[in-house]
Amino acid sequence: MKPSKLLLPLFFVLAIATACKTNTLTGKKTLNFFGDNKPLFAMSLKQYETFLSQHEVVRGTENARLVSRIGKDIAKAAKTYFSYKGQPNLLDEYDWEYHLVKRDQVNAWCMPGGKIVFYTGIMGIADNPDGIAAIMGHEVAHALADHGAQRMSMGILQQAGGMITAEVSKNQDDRNRERIMMAYGIGTTVGGMLPFSRKHVTEADKIGLELMTIAGYKPEEAPKLWERMKAQSKGGQPEFLSTHPVKKGVLQT
């Protein structure tokens, strides 16, 4: 094997080591290639504006006003939350936006930098202001904990790992090469991404409950919300739950 090929895994390991940073919110070491929020926030803003330009934004309705009002309450709670932690200026770069979009899917999300969208399809399941606050707190928690940056970093890592795997296996016979690539594919799906997602959901559940409580909403509505979400799926899986794997215990939280 050529020396250049031997160096590839070394560079790979060094990249991981330098990208492991302490998460401000959780205090845990996480993989994050985006040390500065500005590039990530700029990318999020561009994608957010593109999304809104391609979908019907609902304005002037009671639900639209609720999403905006509760979003502001949760954003204010987030600032209070970080003030408790001695970091009152941590969210100064956030430029919060809250929109209700006409889509039947049961979904809501918050991009890095505070760009929030609720779909009309989730409003019936939210059912009341406390239910909206539970969803809002959960999605904002994902953004505050840098889950978007971590997911993107994991994607970069997997792409780089795939390139290394292909390079290392290039001179193997076809059968061995196929085995290596298959093993890599299974490893990234089962051993990396899915547990990572559940970890994020658990963190967002905890932080989201704190945010909605600080904002003056009833945290006991959260498990009722997840029960309604589960019942609505009727054996299927709404888009929200497909991107938010939920353990059974969460429903009794």
Residue spans for each PLM region:
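A Zn2+-metalloprotease active-site environment signal
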Residues: 5-8, 20-253
